[in-house]
């Protein structure tokens, strides 16, 4: 890698149209996991593949599910409206109370289910992967959360503004926003910020870019290391001059269109599969979480400064087809040893991942904005893939 360079990543807020859709899709997944046990259905039997489209005064939800019959369209609609309200949409072109919601969910294909379900419940018959695909995990020691600095700080800027908006401190700012941070690296380490972009919806129509900068600049400075912003840092705040019409009214949203924001901001490869709206039999989601977990634990164990890890699966096949690790020249042991160590330390079948990371829970709506990675593990099992509890086992295995 070059010693000196610039790298840029972006983030978007929970009110971005695509993120509204991710949130809705994950709310449906959580609903099925919450209601399943009440109906006596095992969480292992829950299936959800939910896609959402949101546009002016309209939400369309489509996909395949398997779960309790007690989950009705009225219940789904109620959950969706509550999510839109929580995000903050009460504008003429998209209001949580009045937008039309169309629900087009149907049972999962039997052809897909036969390759995923255990053939003989209660036996050791393995569950296969829900689809073929490749998944990547990544970690680097350049931030405390072992995430790349550009995406780490792009998320942090918008999270701080969002917290202020929800608290009522920033009543003139709307839910829809984007950030972008260009980080200067020297000797492979982040040392400063060259460019800052924030585009933020405002609820007062005649606000100028200067007015918006007055509102958001304190949060940008709070998010970034103090000495990283200098007189050479270039600011772009609402560079088009006006951002009054926001959210799905201004730009149609779809589930799964922010996969780089969801992961590593472009600093690592991506297998192409989105996360939101999918239950953990879908290895697009669960194996990507496992890949991050393993890469993070390798770095946390001091076995490498950077780590990229790839897993590959085939539909209906339980074991991963391949495990690949690249420590980018920073490894303290060989990649071959690390590949063997991760296979010994964790069962990487779909059932093994779901068990190890405790994924059969309603923990997904919270992942739908500000990244699935670099988050703090929750007491109820949310963000379990961010734990570093495998580090000691990996050190012993090598």
Swiss-Prot record:
Pathway: Amino-acid biosynthesis; S-adenosyl-L-methionine biosynthesis; S-adenosyl-L-methionine from L-methionine: step 1/1. Residues 108-118 are annotated as: Flexible loop. It holds the Pfam family S-AdoMet_synt_M. Keywords: ATP-binding, Cytoplasm, Magnesium, Metal-binding, Nucleotide-binding, One-carbon metabolism, Potassium, Transferase. Its cofactor is Mg(2+); K(+). GO terms for molecular function: ATP binding; magnesium ion binding; methionine adenosyltransferase activity. It is found in: Cytoplasm. Its main location: cytoplasm. ATP binds at residues 16, 176-178, 242-243, 251, 257-258, 274, 278. L-methionine binds at residues 64, 108, 251, 282. GO terms for cellular component: cytoplasm. CDD domains: S-AdoMet_synt (cd18079). Mg(2+) binds at residue 18. GO terms for biological process: one-carbon metabolic process; S-adenosylmethionine biosynthetic process. It is an enzyme of class 2 (transferase). Binds 2 divalent ions per subunit. Binds 1 potassium ion per subunit. PANTHER family: S-ADENOSYLMETHIONINE SYNTHETASE (PTHR11964). Catalyzes the formation of S-adenosylmethionine (AdoMet) from methionine and ATP. The overall synthetic reaction is composed of two sequential steps, AdoMet formation and the subsequent tripolyphosphate hydrolysis which occurs prior to release of AdoMet from the enzyme. Homotetramer; dimer of dimers. This is S-adenosylmethionine synthase.
């Amino acid at each position: 890698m070059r010693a000196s360079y610039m790298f840029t990543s972006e983030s978007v807020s929970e009110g971005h149209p695509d993120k509204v859709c991710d949130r809705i899709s994950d709310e449906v997944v959580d609903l099925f996991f919450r209601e399943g046990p009440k109906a006596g259905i095992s969480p292992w039997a829950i299936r959800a593949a939910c896609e959402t489209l949101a546009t002016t005064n309209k939400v369309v939800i489509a996909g395949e599910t398997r779960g309790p019959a007690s989950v009705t369209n009225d219940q789904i609609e109620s959950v969706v409206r509550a999510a839109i309200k929580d995000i903050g949409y009460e504008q003429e072109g998209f209001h949580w109370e009045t937008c039309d919601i169309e629900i087009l969910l149907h049972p999962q294909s039997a052809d897909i289910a036969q390759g995923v379900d255990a053939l003989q419940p209660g036996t050791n018959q393995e569950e296969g992967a829900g689809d073929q695909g490749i998944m990547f995990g990544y970690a680097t020691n350049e931030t405390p959360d072992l995430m790349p600095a550009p995406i780490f700080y792009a998320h942090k800027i918008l999270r701080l503004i969002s917290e202020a908006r929800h608290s009522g401190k920033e009543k003139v700012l709307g839910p829809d926003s984007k950030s972008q941070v260009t980080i200067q690296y020297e000797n492979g380490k982040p040392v400063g910020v060259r460019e800052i972009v924030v585009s933020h919806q405002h609820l007062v129509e005649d606000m100028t870019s200067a007015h918006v900068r007055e509102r958001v600049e304190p949060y940008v400075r709070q998010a970034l290391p103090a000495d990283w912003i200098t007189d050479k840092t270039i600011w772009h705040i609402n560079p088009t001059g006006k951002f009054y019409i926001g959210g799905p009214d201004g730009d149609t949203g779809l589930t799964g269109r922010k996969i780089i924001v969801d992961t590593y901001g472009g600093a690592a490869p991506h297998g192409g599969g989105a996360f939101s709206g999918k239950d953990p039999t879908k290895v697009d989601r669960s194996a990507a979480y496992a890949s991050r977990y393993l890469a993070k634990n390798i770095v946390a164990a001091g076995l490498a400064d950077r780590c990229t890890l790839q897993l590959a699966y085939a539909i209906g096949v339980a074991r991963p087809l391949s495990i690949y690790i690249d420590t980018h020249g920073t490894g303290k042991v060989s990649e071959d040893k690390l590949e063997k160590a991760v296979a010994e330390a964790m069962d990487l079948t779909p059932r093994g991942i779901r068990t190890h990371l405790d994924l059969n829970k309603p923990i997904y709506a919270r992942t739908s904005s500000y990244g699935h990675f670099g988050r703090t593990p929750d007491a109820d099992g949310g963000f379990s893939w961010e734990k570093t509890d495998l580090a000691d086992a990996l050190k012993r295995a090598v």
